[in-house]
Amino acid sequence: MKIVCYKDKILKAINSVVKAVASKTTMPILEGILIQTNDNEIKLTTYDLEIGIEYIMDCEVEEQGSTVVNAIMFSEIIRKLPDTEIKIYLDTNNLLVIECEGSLYKLATMDPTEFPELPKINVENSIQIEQNVLKNMIRRTIFAVSNEENRPIFTGCLFCLLYTSPSPRDA
């Protein structure tokens, strides 16, 4: 695997997926980011067995491949690099090498085949909604959500889809 991308693009992707990294787990693979290449894009995936996030971004892919790297260490290194082009590749010892303007970092990797697959989503019963509409809906109802973990049923929001017809004859 060998990719070249700009810091701001990959940092945005990392910041998006790092929210689903397991903090306390007996499975070290869940503390990592799965990095996969496909043509001229990379896919970053995190999954803590409850929440999973995938982020696909365009970048220059020189060699195909995949790996898993510790999310916290990877994000901290990328965050501290200058705002320029970054080379990320696997060396012969299966270490993830990060190069940027004379800086060189090497991180241990994990076997990507051990990373759990995200569950398949049934797109048959899905809807599309604009981001600002969803945010507004959540903002107007979140005050009623409980912070107490002893009654987990009250710590979430129910999404209920109702179908309405504009025609009075359908009623």
Model features per residue range: what roles?
Residues 32, 86-102, 153-159:
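Short, glycine/charge-rich beta-strand/loop segments that flank catalytic centers
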Residues 4, 8-28, 104-159:
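Intrinsic, low-complexity N-terminal interaction/targeting segments
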Residues 45, 77-79, 86, 137-143, ...:
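A structural feature that tracks compact, well-ordered secondary-structure segments
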Residues 20, 55-79, 149:
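A cross-kingdom feature marking solvent-exposed beta-strand/loop segments within repeated
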Residues 38-52:
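N-terminal glycine-rich anion-binding loops that anchor highly charged ligand groups
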Residues 49-53, 59-61, 104-106:
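Short, surface-exposed beta-strand-loop junctions and turns on beta-sheet-rich folds
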Residues 10, 35, 42-44, 74, ...:
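Short, structured motif recognition centered on aromatic/hydrophobic residues
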Residues 163-171:
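Single conserved hydrophobic/aromatic residue that forms the stacking wall/gate
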